[in-house]
A protein has these predicted regions:
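Feature detects amphipathic, helix-rich regulatory segments
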Residues: 1-197
Length: 197
């Protein structure tokens, strides 16, 4: 049988088996930088996303502390994220996020593999079945306890690492080719402009 047709059964684990909800608040205002979670750009500084700070030092005491490699679920619905995005903090520093976000820290799973899982739409049916768009049409509503019941296909840790590394390489290759395409399009445009002057 061709390798591509072999059905592989991976263990299904609940998100709660591999992650814990972060409840650490910024009560002593130790962390001053506020993050946001964008469907397009991932976890980034709020200042970079909005060109200024939305939060202020008086309001961030009740915000959750987001450590390096933590994951963040943003319930804001968009074209790119119909149930809201889940992204990993890869900024290499800590920040804080509004309690509107769900922050979780993983264990016993490769973070790159899990990041790619959340870039897929595999988990969307679970969200649609267990949550709703709520009162506000731009926000998705799901209880934390239900969110952490989400099934995650979990191969061996070695296979997770291979899958994550493969998808990273593929993504980098696509980015490289997109840059080349943009260069060629600029050259073509310049040639057309010179040709018809």
């Amino acid at each position: 049988m061709p390798e591509c047709l072999v059905t592989i059964y991976w263990e299904q684990r609940k998100l709660s088996d591999i992650a814990d909800k972060v409840t650490e608040k910024n009560t002593n205002l130790v962390v001053q930088e506020t993050f946001t979670n964008s469907a397009e750009f991932g976890v980034i500084s709020q200042r970079d996303f909005f060109d200024h700070d939305i939060s202020n030092s008086e309001s961030i005491g009740g915000y959750y502390v987001v450590r390096d490699e933590d994951f963040v679920y943003n319930p804001r619905i968009s074209v790119n994220a119909p149930v809201g995005p889940v992204n990993r903090n890869k900024l290499g520093r800590n920040g804080v996020m509004s309690p509107l976000y769900t922050v979780f820290r993983t264990h016993n799973i490769d973070t790159t593999y899990l990041e790619w899982f959340f870039k897929s739409n595999y988990w969307h049916p679970f969200m649609f079945f267990n949550g709703d768009s709520g009162v506000r049409s731009d926000r998705f509503s799901i209880k934390d306890a239900v969110f952490f019941e989400m099934p995650i296909p979990t191969p061996s840790i070695e296979e997770q690492k291979r899958i994550g590394a493969y998808l990273d390489r593929l993504s980098n290759l696509i980015t490289l080719h997109q840059r080349e395409l943009e260069k060629l399009q600029k050259i073509k445009k310049a040639m057309l402009e010179k040709m018809f002057v």
